[in-house]
C-alpha cells in the first residue's frame, strides 16, 4: 500500500515538473522576460485567491448549508472518529440539498477544512460505506490536495496566458523588434500549449483521486466499503446527475465521483476522475481478495 502511495506522489511530482517545463518552453518564445514575469504573477495571484477562498467558492456553488451534530449525528460521529484517529482537527460539516449523490472536501489545510455530503449520498449509502467516503474526503484534506490542485491550476494558467500573449504578439507585430516570438513558436504555443497544460492538470487531479482512495481506505481499514460506495455512486450519478452549469463544472474535480452524466463531459483523457472500474479494482487489490460482505 505504501508503494502505491509513493508511486502516486512520484507521478504527481512528475506532472508538476511537466507543467513547469511547458512554462519554460512557452516563455522561451519571448525575448522580453517582462512578459513571462507578468504572466506568472497574474496566474499565481489569481490561483492564490482561489486557494484561500476555495471552501467558500465550492460550498456556495453547491448551495451547501452548515449542519449541527443534532441535525447529522451519524456524519458527525464518523468524522470525529476519523479525525481523532488521524490526529487532525475536526472539519466543518455541510449538507448540500440535492438528490445528486456525491461528497467533497475543501479548505486550504486541516484547520480550515470543510466536508460536504449531498442529501442524495446520505440516502443511498449505508453507514459503513459513508464512513469509507468520509475517509476518502478527509484524506484529500490531510494530503493537501487543495494546495496541489491550486499549484497545478496556477502553472496551467501561466501556460494558457503565455499562449494567448504569443498569439496576439504574433498576430499584431513585435517580431521585427526582436522581442516577439517566431511564427513557429506562435503556432506551437498558442495551439498546443493550453491543450497540453489542461491534460497535465487533469492528470494531476486523477492521480490525487487514486491517492485519496488509497489513504482513505487505509484510514478506515475498509477498502471494500469504499469500493461498494463507488459502485453505488457510479449508478447514482448517472440516474441523478448535477446540471452541467459553469459554477458546478468548475468544482467537479472536488467530488468523489464525476457528477455529470456520461456524454456530457469530455472523454477519459479530459476527465477529472479516473475510471471507476480501475479505482474499484485497486481497492479490491488492497483488500487482498476479501469479500467483506460487499460485492
Curated annotation (Swiss-Prot):
GO molecular function: metalloendopeptidase activity; zinc ion binding
Keyword Magnesium: no
Cofactor binding summary note: Binds 1 zinc ion per subunit.
Designated gene of the protein: htpX
GO biological process: proteolysis
Location, primary (coarse class): membrane
GO cellular component: plasma membrane
Swiss-Prot/TrEMBL keywords: Cell membrane, Hydrolase, Membrane, Metal-binding, Metalloprotease, Protease, Transmembrane, Transmembrane helix, Zinc
Membrane-crossing segments per the record: 10-30, 32-52, 151-171, 184-204
Pfam family, one: Peptidase_M48
Organism whose genome encodes this protein: Nocardia farcinica (strain IFM 10152)
Name of the protein in its database record: Protease HtpX homolog
Residues reported in the UniProt entry to bind Zn(2+): 136, 140, 209
UniProt subcellular location: Cell membrane
Protein family membership: Belongs to the peptidase M48B family.
Active site, renumbered: 137
